[in-house]
From Swiss-Prot:
<dbReference type="GO" id="GO:0005886">
    <property type="term" value="C:plasma membrane"/>
</dbReference>
<dbReference type="InterPro" id="IPR017896">
    <property type="entry name" value="4Fe4S_Fe-S-bd"/>
</dbReference>
<keyword id="KW-0997">Cell inner membrane</keyword>
<keyword id="KW-0874">Quinone</keyword>
<keyword id="KW-0520">NAD</keyword>
<keyword id="KW-1003">Cell membrane</keyword>
<feature type="binding site">
    <location>
        <position position="102"/>
    </location>
    <ligand>
        <name>[4Fe-4S] cluster 2</name>
    </ligand>
</feature>
<comment type="function">
    <text>NDH-1 shuttles electrons from NADH, via FMN and iron-sulfur (Fe-S) centers, to quinones in the respiratory chain. The immediate electron acceptor for the enzyme in this species is believed to be ubiquinone. Couples the redox reaction to proton translocation (for every two electrons transferred, four hydrogen ions are translocated across the cytoplasmic membrane), and thus conserves the redox energy in a proton gradient.</text>
</comment>
<feature type="binding site">
    <location>
        <position position="69"/>
    </location>
    <ligand>
        <name>[4Fe-4S] cluster 1</name>
    </ligand>
</feature>
<keyword id="KW-0004">4Fe-4S</keyword>
<dbReference type="InterPro" id="IPR010226">
    <property type="entry name" value="NADH_quinone_OxRdtase_chainI"/>
</dbReference>
<comment type="subunit">
    <text>NDH-1 is composed of 14 different subunits. Subunits NuoA, H, J, K, L, M, N constitute the membrane sector of the complex.</text>
</comment>
<keyword id="KW-0479">Metal-binding</keyword>
<dbReference type="Pfam" id="PF12838">
    <property type="entry name" value="Fer4_7"/>
</dbReference>
<dbReference type="GO" id="GO:0051539">
    <property type="term" value="F:4 iron, 4 sulfur cluster binding"/>
</dbReference>
<keyword id="KW-0830">Ubiquinone</keyword>
<dbReference type="GO" id="GO:0009060">
    <property type="term" value="P:aerobic respiration"/>
</dbReference>
Length: 162
């Protein structure tokens, strides 16, 4: 037999009333759920999304084929091949990122000495096949050309944190 207090609590369903009070408190509280995709929350300028390769203002690719991004990538998602130029510097012939492997850690962006590879704010992309998420050098350069204004603005805002 339980004590009189246990009988009283079970008779008046004290636990149930406590639970209902918590539910009632949150039922009438202000809603914080965002109805995506109709509503969108603001993104940080430091958001790490889809990759892009940048160019200098004269149109030349920034990548100097140092392969630091390939070496630092923990997921081994970056593949780079390079060949020497006539002036002795190197040029990338292949720069591929496999987004099915990428964990979007941002190490490639931090390792790049010339800010050639960056991660944009783009997070809405898809692929119907596995190969659609394999980005080649041309696709990455196209992303960089398309979003260069936003990338430059984000890099300027991020400069104080670097």
């Amino acid at each position: 037999m339980g004590s009189m207090k246990e009988i009283f609590n079970s008779l008046f369903l004290k636990e149930l009333l406590k639970g209902m009070s918590v539910t009632g408190k949150y039922f009438f509280a202000r809603k914080i759920t965002v109805q995506y995709p109709e509503e969108k929350t603001p993104q940080s300028f430091r958001f790490r999304g889809l990759h892009a390769l940048r160019r200098y203002p004269n149109g030349e690719e920034r990548c100097i084929a140092c392969k630091l991004c390939e070496a630092i990538c923990p997921a081994l998602a970056i593949t780079i091949e390079a060949e020497p130029r006539d002036d002795g510097s190197r040029r990338t012939t292949r720069y591929d990122i496999d987004l099915t492997k990428c964990i979007f850690c941002g190490f490639c962006e931090e390792a790049c000495p010339v800010d050639a590879v960056v991660e944009t704010r783009i997070f809405e992309y898809h692929g119907e096949k596995r190969g659609d998420l394999y980005y080649t050098k041309q696709m990455l350069l196209a992303n960089g050309d398309r979003y260069e204004d936003q990338i430059a603005k984000d890099r300027e805002l991020d400069a104080s944190y670097r």
